[in-house]
Design a protein with these regions (language model features):
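SAM-dependent methyltransferase catalytic region
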Residues: 1-190
């Protein structure tokens, strides 16, 4: 009997440690900042959303397995939290960005619930060219059309809270498939 009680206390202690670890992991998941700096139609953001949903679901299942008590949580709320707090995208093409928003909405829409607001986390701009570009190159050398096409992106202005917390935790993206000649035409042969 004493051995049984000792094993039972050891098991309870291990369960408490595991529950603490799960809660720490859940908190870290909620704080994770994922960026696609050339998000296009949002394919990588959708995959990141699915991964974060799976991880949140796994944590809830582990808590249920250990405690025998199901947590009260709503996957729609989890999805809205992920969209609001975890996923960020930038694209130089405004139309592609709208397609990314539409793809995320189509992927997460639930009847009877409003669509998530994505404008704060999905931004239009050239993620490779920052606001100091015109300090290095005289603005008047570029026509208005060229300036619009260059579309400098100010990370600090677009995502101040993320930058203040140290930046993004994870960057997901395809490599830029751009001809070098296009860069030379816009930026010169530096």
């Amino acid at each position: 009997y004493q051995r049984f009680q000792k094993d039972r206390r050891r098991t309870a202690k291990a369960a408490a440690v595991w529950l603490d670890a799960l809660e720490a992991y859940r908190l870290r998941l909620r704080q994770l900042k994922v960026l696609d700096p050339a998000c296009g139609s949002g394919a990588f953001l959708i995959q990141a959303l699915e991964l974060l949903k799976r991880e949140q679901r796994w944590v809830a299942e582990e808590v249920l397995r250990i405690t025998g008590q199901a947590e009260v949580w709503d996957m729609d709320d989890v999805v809205n939290d992920i969209l609001a707090s975890n996923l960020y995208g930038v694209d130089i093409n405004a139309e592609s960005l709208e397609i990314a928003k539409l793809a995320l909405w189509m992927h997460t829409a639930t009847p009877g619930r409003p669509l998530s607001r994505l404008d704060d986390n999905l931004r239009c701009g050239n993620s490779l060219v920052g606001p100091d570009f015109y300090q290095q190159h005289q603005r008047e050398l570029f026509s208005k059309a060229e300036q619009e096409r260059i579309n400098v992106f100010d990370w600090q202005a677009a995502f101040p809270a993320v930058i203040a917390q140290g930046g993004f935790d994870c960057i997901v993206s395809n490599p830029p498939y751009v001809k070098l000649q296009n860069f030379r035409r816009v930026f010169g042969s530096a």
